[in-house]
Amino acid sequence: MARVAGVDLPRNKQARIALTYIYGIGNPRALRILTAANVDPFRKIQDLSEDEVNRIRQVIEAEGQVEGDLRKDVAMHIKRLIEIQSYRGLRHRRSLPVRGQRTHTNARTRKGPRRGTVAGKKKATKT
């Protein structure tokens, strides 16, 4: 199993698909990496030589951030938005949609499960 950027790539998948298992690499970027490394995108990972895997590693390192560094960068950007108390930071803090979507209906994924009324709870009486 080839290990690239701290991720074990699945051996039985094509190289272009296997690279998308790395956080920060989608289909277009995977194809760009493979063409820069002179590797056939349709070859399976198990068929790649050690030299080809090393070339892929070098291209990924040169191309930009992936995996842990990218996750840390994204988290820092969100934390900065929260600290400067921007509107987007407020939406992140309240776990609401950030990019202008409606929330009256929908947005259940972002808002979480419904918090309905609690059965059996009575208000305190005045004495």
Curated annotation (Swiss-Prot):
GO terms for biological process: translation. The keyword NADP does not apply. GO terms for molecular function: rRNA binding; structural constituent of ribosome; tRNA binding. Keywords: Ribonucleoprotein, Ribosomal protein, RNA-binding, rRNA-binding, tRNA-binding. Transmembrane segments: none annotated. InterPro entries: Rbsml_uS13_C, Ribosomal_uS13, Ribosomal_uS13-like_H2TH, Ribosomal_uS13_bac-type, Ribosomal_uS13_CS. Part of the 30S ribosomal subunit. Forms a loose heterodimer with protein S19. Forms two bridges to the 50S subunit in the 70S ribosome. Located at the top of the head of the 30S subunit, it contacts several helices of the 16S rRNA. In the 70S ribosome it contacts the 23S rRNA (bridge B1a) and protein L5 of the 50S subunit (bridge B1b), connecting the 2 subunits; these bridges are implicated in subunit movement. Contacts the tRNAs in the A and P-sites. Belongs to the universal ribosomal protein uS13 family. This is Small ribosomal subunit protein uS13. It comes from Acidobacterium capsulatum (strain ATCC 51196 / DSM 11244 / BCRC 80197 / JCM 7670 / NBRC 15755 / NCIMB 13165 / 161). The lineage of its organism: Bacteria, Pseudomonadati, Acidobacteriota, Terriglobia, Terriglobales.
